[in-house]
A protein has these predicted regions:
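Alpha-helical transmembrane segments in inner-membrane proteins
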Residues: 1-334
Length: 334
């Protein structure tokens, strides 16, 4: 833990916000089309309809906004899930959320010939929410109620089921593969602000709920027996965490598709910086998640110019070594 007191943590938040703003600006400027900081400033002050100005305002600005907000949502979701399940490798994949979203998109494409990104977004949100609710219900069965191990097992089972069904439908209809493959890889390219704004209220509600229960999560993280001994209603806390997870991850998947590793990597980096106080973990996760996804998106544009790599592949390249490191060290991030 590097930031040992609240004063240092506040300074760390300010530095993180400044770094996020800096990378956000670079995200608007960098890409296949050659633009400069001066051109970017003129695009906002004196828009003239040129190709450079259109690219900056209509393509890169929405892309940077979406990358920031989606990265933030995924990182906060990862922190919530790791607290809920006591699993240091937990992420939205754990609850079958990504698989559920992909399955609903493929169903819409296969049976109803839906192929627009706007429709994909709502199908993905419904699929993510349905998967999360089913897993939560299955994990709550039995006399003990919801337990981390039952939730993990239910999530793994549902993820496997949704993935199997989705791949089965794609094999039966290979023409649908090309239309959905880029979305399934996870990307912020070509996503409109209209899609983001349609789910933004759910993201805001999920984030506010997470911040409101952050102190209760500190008590819950001591162990359920200790939390109950201190008078906490652990069932209510787990339910609220689950609602926040579904709102945040469902919205993020709806906008950008299934993007992995942000939810695993960022909480460990943040815990190494600020310790185990969720009142600080969650805001730091929000900032760091936005930074990491923006960096991954910039790399996705530049690594194979003029071609673009889906940002989900870039996050996998960044996250896989870190994932292996965490697994080898038994999930200890600090």
């Amino acid at each position: 833990m590097l930031l040992l007191n609240n004063r240092r943590r506040i300074i760390g938040l300010i530095i993180g916000l400044l770094l996020l703003c800096t990378i956000f600006i670079f995200s608007i400027v960098l890409g296949y089309a050659d633009t400069s900081f001066k051109t970017a400033i003129k695009a906002f002050q004196q828009f003239n309809g040129s190709n450079e100005h259109i690219i900056i305002k209509e393509v890169r600005l929405p892309r940077a906004l979406i990358g920031t907000i989606v990265g933030s949502s995924l990182a906060i979701t990862g922190a919530l899930l790791q607290a809920l399940t006591k699993n240091p490798l937990a992420s939205p994949d754990l609850l079958g959320i990504n698989s559920g979203a992909s399955f609903f998109v493929i169903i819409g494409l296969f049976f109803f010939s839906i192929n627009s990104l706007q429709a994909f977004a709502w199908l993905a949100f419904l699929g993510a929410a349905a998967a999360g609710l089913i897993v939560y219900f299955l994990g709550s069965l039995g006399n003990e109620g919801l337990t981390p191990i039952k939730l993990t097992l239910a999530g793994a089972a549902m993820a496997a089921m949704f993935s199997s069904f989705a791949h089965g439908f794609l094999v039966m209809n290979e023409s649908a593969l090309e239309e959905v493959l880029f979305w399934m890889a996870g990307s912020v390219q070509g996503r409109s602000l209209e899609i983001l704004f349609s789910v933004l209220p759910y993201m805001i509600m999920g984030t506010l709920l997470a911040f409101l229960i952050s102190n209760k999560m500190n008590v819950y993280s001591m162990g359920e027996d200790v939390a109950r001994g201190l008078g906490q209603r652990t069932g209510t806390v787990k339910l609220l965490i689950g609602i926040s997870v579904i709102l945040l991850s469902g919205s993020a998947v709806a906008v950008a598709g299934p993007i992995g590793f942000i939810g695993i990597v960022v909480p460990h980096i943040v815990k190494w910086l600020v310790g185990n106080d969720y009142r600080w973990i969650l805001p730091f996760c929000g900032i760091t998640g936005g930074i990491l996804l923006l960096l991954a998106d910039i790399g996705a544009r530049l690594i194979l110019m003029p071609q673009e790599v889906p940002v989900g592949i870039m996050t996998a390249i960044i996250g896989t070594p870190f994932f292996i490191y965490i697994a080898r060290n038994g999930g200890k991030s600090s």
